[in-house]
Amino acid sequence: MDKEKNIQAVVSETEILHESSVNFLKIFEAYRVEKKISTRKLVQGLMSDRAFLDIKKGNYILAKSDWEFLMQRMGIVTEYFETIVSRKELEDWRIREDICLLILENQSEAKKRLEQYRSKCLKEKKEIPKIQNQFCMKITWLLSKSVLTAEELYDLSCKAVACTVAEEKWQEKLTTLYLGPAELETTLLTVWSLYLLGKTTKALELYWKIKCYPKDYEWEPRMQQMIIPQIAWLGMKLYQRLHMDDEALKVGENALELLRDQSSQRYVYPILQELISLEEMYGKEYKRIQQLKKFKVAFENVYEANKLPCMRMWQCSSIKNSYDVSLILKRMRYSMEKTQSEVCTDENGIPFLSIKQLSRSD
């Protein structure tokens, strides 16, 4: 058979990303219907009903990170799905990852990278998108913890939550809202701020709602491990200060067990650090303490060998099984044995892309 007859028309990057977005929409709708959740409740705070309708009609492409955010609000783990993403989205993820790696051990460099990321977002759009802005405000809170007053930290944490949560009385209505791990992580900053304000009872009430949220909404363990360690770490700090030592140990040990079951290292180092400190303080079993110390040293060795910090933040978004669309196009061009000039011209001989633009993606 003539090889030319088997060659499909070259598709553009936009078409591939559009198809990827459509596939995510199908998965999203299937889960939404199965869980009997209204679209309005899931997109609330992130976009309007009309904007989501445009996406359903195919008039607008939603990025993989946005779909991931919406899926996580339903408690769905998205790292299992293979997706095609733009190079820009991969670059944005890597910049955020750099900030996460720096934030706890090199704050001056983290601050510099944060400003660069903000500037990059503002160059591309008139304002920073809601999900990205929430990330920036979380980092700002952590950078400002030793500088701002408790009241200012509380206001900043509430503004960070409001980036994606439209409900003004979210603290009272938390259990009725559909939130993902990144949003719950932001609400923990409000708990911390309330405690610093001396509002201990209110802080504990909110903390308890957040702690129960993943199980109340029946998140699978793989999703729970994205937020339980942060909940546990803050819980250990709060319970210690309130002299609730047994609760502090319990919440830490439960988090460690979850991480072990999921073969996850998210925040495992600070959890181990706190548990060792607690168990030594209260004279717990010697063998248990030695075992925890052994785990801690093992992680230190692994991180040192890979030149990674022991103390870091972790993103709730993932690029696992995500493929760069420009590389997909490049491979398609090679497999079809077409030149750059041929790829940049449609069937009528009209160029729709410059060779210079294609070279950038190649």
Could you tell me what each predicted segment is?
Residues 83-85, 119-131, 162-180, 215-225, ...:
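Flexible helix-coil transition and linker loops at the boundaries of alpha-helical arrays
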Residues 96-100, 135-140, 189, 230-234, ...:
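"A position-specific structural signal for the A-helix of alpha-solenoid helical repeats
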Residues 34-54, 338-346:
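Short alpha-helical DNA-recognition segment
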Residues 63-81:
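DNA major-groove recognition helix of helix-turn-helix/homeodomain DNA-binding modules
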Residues 115-123, 158-169, 208-219, 253-260, ...:
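Amphipathic alpha-helical segments of tetratricopeptide repeats
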Residues 2-35, 326, 331:
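A short, Lys/Arg-rich alpha-helix, primarily the initiator
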